[in-house]
Amino acid sequence: MKIMSKLNDQQQFRRDKLKNLVKNGFNFPSSTFEHDNLVEINEKFSQKSKEFFLENQVKIAFAGRLIRQRGPFFIIFSQNLQFQAYISKEFQKKNEFIFANLDLGDIIEVSGYLFKTQTGQLSIKVNNFSLLTKSLHPLPDQYYGIENPDEKYRKRYLDLLVNSESAKTFRLRSKIISLIRTFFDSQGFLEVDTPVLQPVLGGASAKPFITYYNSLSQNFYLRIATELPLKKLLVAGFDRVYEIGKIFRNEGFDSTHNPEFTSIEFYQAYANLEKIMDQTENLFRFLFEKLNLDPANFDFSNKKINFLEKFARYDMIEITSKLMNFDLKSANFADLVEKAKKEGVKIEPFFKKGHLINKFFEKFVEPTLINPTFIIGHPIEISPLAKSNPNNPNFTLRAELFICGKEFANMFDELNDPIDQLSRFQAQIIEKNQGNQEASEIDNEFVQALEYGMPPAGGCGIGIDRLTMLLTKNESIREVILFPQLKPKKD
């Protein structure tokens, strides 16, 4: 097995320096000072005059990574900013051994007094210096960054060090998740955690990852949704719940899909589909406001998107019929099969009328939905957890939110009739036996929970990765996931 590729000259020089340091007692020491907050230091002292620091001694200490050096001036990256340290020639000569073995990329700790340079830059004049960590590899160029995209994702730690835009994206992602929590917490929702390992496949239509639970001698699934356990909590009297967590779907990855992703699902007792659509729309507006984004003229994927106006709402079968110039309502299954063949739509053995209507929607309508649009009224065959429409039982009280041709949210008027739910699960088993690998299984424990009585409720799921793509204006999901899944690297 290959342990390490051949070292280049720079790597060998650094290892030789580390050997010298170790011989003289260096052992990757712990930090020794209480560190100051550099953001606060900048805010408090950056506008002070040079004379202020001659009259007032302000001592600070901090640690960070050495990223540039110009004579006695050392630029240290710490606490998400760059701070300049002045280390006199006399101090360097006094500590000649350490500085002779110092390289860019090393992590150092300094303390000393603040002063202003001739150009007015706030700096620290160092009187204590420690090497904390020796870097054995040179950092990528600060200007060019990591040019190979695959290497950028594999070595995200380097990308974040040298690419300020990447670092900004992930700090913003964290803020987005925090704001989502604020939005729901302020409305009395309770954040909960439900199991990642599930004995029964359900809550969505997706291929699962399967693992083996040794102590139970049983296969388990990594969850494909959090829906069913959250709805059990509605039965338990928790009227407003949400969960932010990882979801796993054993499917392909592309610019908008990753097999492991983060979602939020929220459920509200006594809310109908209209209320949940309004709630989702309000969440988007809340995020735009708190992130200081322009909702009326938002640029994404070379398109102008208007989030200020009320989101459009269209019935699925009506808009699909219109854009296809084909009456889906009056067509029978044979008509739809014939139309599918003409349009190059693949027909699976388990397809019924509703499956084909959905495929036509995906082909003819979905790519055209640029501004935020709710599509309402999905076929019952593809919506086993949503209430059927009392005025048209072949369709459901379900909606999806589309932006820029992509799905961003999926919401239901939740099915709470246990008899109907069991029947839907049984229909899913028939589909599975006919080859639908994404069909759900019968979750008898969930059905039994419904038998105790679940209040009428609405619920919604939103992919946080795709939402972050939108709000940070990134067109690849890999840009908003710290360590995205990649194909194995070839030797």
UniProtKB/Swiss-Prot annotation:
GO biological process terms on file: lysyl-tRNA aminoacylation
Gene from which the chain derives: lysS
Keyword terms of this UniProt record: Aminoacyl-tRNA synthetase, ATP-binding, Cytoplasm, Ligase, Magnesium, Metal-binding, Nucleotide-binding, Protein biosynthesis
Organism: Mesomycoplasma hyopneumoniae (strain J / ATCC 25934 / NCTC 10110)
EC number in record: 6.1.1.6
Gene3D superfamilies: Bira Bifunctional Protein, Domain 2, Nucleic acid-binding proteins
Binding residue positions for Mg(2+) 2: 407
Protein name: Lysine--tRNA ligase
Subunit structure: Homodimer.
Cofactor(s) the protein requires to work: Mg(2+)
GO MF term (any one): tRNA binding
Family as reported in the entry's similarity comment: Belongs to the class-II aminoacyl-tRNA synthetase family.
Reactions listed under catalytic activity: tRNA(Lys) + L-lysine + ATP = L-lysyl-tRNA(Lys) + AMP + diphosphate
Residues involved in Mg(2+) 1 binding: 400, 407
Superkingdom classification of source: Bacteria
PANTHER family assigned to the protein according to its UniProt record, in alphabetical order: LYSINE--TRNA LIGASE, CHLOROPLASTIC_MITOCHONDRIAL (PTHR42918:SF15), LYSYL-TRNA SYNTHETASE (PTHR42918)
Keyword Cytoplasm assigned: yes
Cofactor binding note of this UniProt entry: Binds 3 Mg(2+) ions per subunit.
